[in-house]
């Protein structure tokens, strides 16, 4: 039995497809290094809607040991005028084996799909929203387990 979680790319795009850019590349790792911790702060892109600037930023904290749980934290910041309800942000992507995932920030919830270790997992519909100045801040949380490759 061997466990592999090879490197992969993660790209994201802003709401409505205004911008798309690669934001990070995950390094290869194996069970000898239990946890990969990658504190990131990305500005995924910004655009204007009715004169209001929308900014997508992603504090990303990835704990992705090949054996164990994986979690990714995302958030998005948008003007309150842009929504009739708090921002619901998340992303979907595939990690491992060089797969590329694309972010989906917008209404509803997205999930994380992991192919790197042979298992899929999706972000539960867990939101905790609060108002920060003129923006809504709503983190998304995802967890799952890598599978084993025999």
From Swiss-Prot:
Expressed at high levels in skin and at lower levels in the developing mammary gland. Disulfide bonds: none annotated. InterPro entries: KRTAP_PMG. The keyword Magnesium does not apply. It comes from the Eukaryota. The keyword Transcription does not apply. GO terms for cellular component: cytosol; intermediate filament. Keywords: Keratin. Belongs to the PMG family. Interacts with hair keratins. In the hair cortex, hair keratin intermediate filaments are embedded in an interfilamentous matrix, consisting of hair keratin-associated proteins (KRTAP), which are essential for the formation of a rigid and resistant hair shaft through their extensive disulfide bond cross-linking with abundant cysteine residues of hair keratins. The matrix proteins include the high-sulfur and high-glycine-tyrosine keratins. This is Keratin-associated protein 15-1. It comes from Mus musculus (Mouse).
């Amino acid at each position: 039995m061997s466990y592999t979680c090879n490197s992969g790319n993660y790209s994201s795009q802003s709401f409505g497809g205004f911008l798309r850019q690669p934001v990070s590349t995950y390094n290869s790792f194996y069970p000898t290094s239990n946890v990969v911790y990658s504190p990131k702060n990305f500005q995924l892109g910004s655009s204007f809607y009715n004169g209001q600037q929308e900014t997508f930023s992603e504090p990303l904290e990835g704990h992705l040991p090949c054996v164990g749980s994986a979690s990714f934290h995302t958030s998005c910041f948008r003007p309150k005028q842009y929504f009739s309800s708090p921002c619901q942000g998340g992303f979907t992507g595939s990690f491992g084996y060089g797969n590329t995932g694309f972010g989906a920030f917008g209404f509803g919830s997205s999930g994380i799909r992991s192919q790197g270790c042979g298992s899929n997992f999706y972000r539960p519909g867990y939101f905790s929203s609060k108002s920060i100045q003129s923006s809504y801040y709503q983190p998304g949380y995802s967890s799952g387990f890598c599978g084993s490759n025999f």
